[in-house]
Amino acid sequence: MQANHHALCPQKNAACRITLAIIRVMCYSIGEEINLHKKSVTLGCMIMKTNQKTVEKKERGISKYIPAFAMFAVFETVAVSLWLSLDNLFYLLNFSYIGTCIAIGLALFAGGWKHARRFVQFAVGSYMLVYLGIISNENMQLEGFWYYLFTGVFEAATIHYAVAKIFGPLIFGRGWCGYACWTAMILDLLPYKQPQKPRKKGLGFIRYIMFALSFGLVAALFLCHAGNLERIMFWLFLGGNALYYVIGIVLAFAFKDNRAFCKYICPITVFLKPMSYFALFRIHCDESKCVGCGKCLKVCPMNVECNKESRERVNGTECILCFECKKACPVKAIK
């Protein structure tokens, strides 16, 4: 019996070893399948996340061009409405051109071109100064507005002021100052793009004096029954612009601030500021992201406290939508 028992042991041991080997192989195979499944799941999740990020990126890519499309739509609406109501093709071409230039500029800025605003300034500003003002003999300054208003003619300067400087700011704030003003177009070429000192307090009253003088000058011409008012308006346009450029350049170097004229002297802001307080398009700051570095305050040409989400006087009526603060923000808190 013992002999038989010893004879069977090697056979049992061999069978056990084979069984264990088979079990190991099966376990290894199952483990590999499990690992493969895990890898497949992980890869699938990664692909889903990548696709999701791609979709989000595309959505962000499209959304950043919304302001450009919106401004184009606004100006095209104005262009078509004036064309149909006044039966004058000029208004269709005029406002379509301005709206197209602004839309292209905003799209270029969204695409990362740093000179986009300057493109719009020269495309629109030079068109209004040279073509409308000098070639077409239209006084687009404040005196021209008073002149057409006194004569009861709703065209040219009166329409320009209604769209760009009285009702338009309800939509785009003081965007006129940042993108279309032919005075600022030249002043922005000067070396003091970033104000060297805080805004001067107590000088804002000068704009109201300039506003009153402009009104009084045109009123006096009508009361005195001056002859050839159209010719006088043309020379007032040329002389007024020359005077503005001289004052603006002198103030820029005196205060080391390119936009000193805009802050203290420009009479147009009397129209722009009240409506700009309610502007639809405006700079927003996510204060939860803001790190308080102050870079936005340093680069703002208008000394706007753009790191505060408010509609206070400075924030609500001084911003020209130049987006210098947005470009300077290191944490993308401004949009």
Predicted regions and their residues:
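Secretory-pathway extracellular proteins and peptide precursors enriched for disulfide-bonded cysteines
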Residues: M1, H6-C9, R282, R311
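Residue-level detector of alpha-helical transmembrane segments in integral membrane proteins
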Residues: A3-N4, N13, R60, A260
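Histidine (H) residue identity feature
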Residues: H5-H6, H37, H225, H284
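Short, positively charged and aromatic/hydrophobic N-terminal segments
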Residues: A7, R17, I22, M26-S29, ...
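Intrinsically disordered, low-complexity N-terminal regions enriched in serine/proline/glycine
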Residues: K12-A15, C27, K64
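Non-ligating segments of multi-cofactor redox enzymes
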Residues: I47-N307, T317, K327, V331-K335
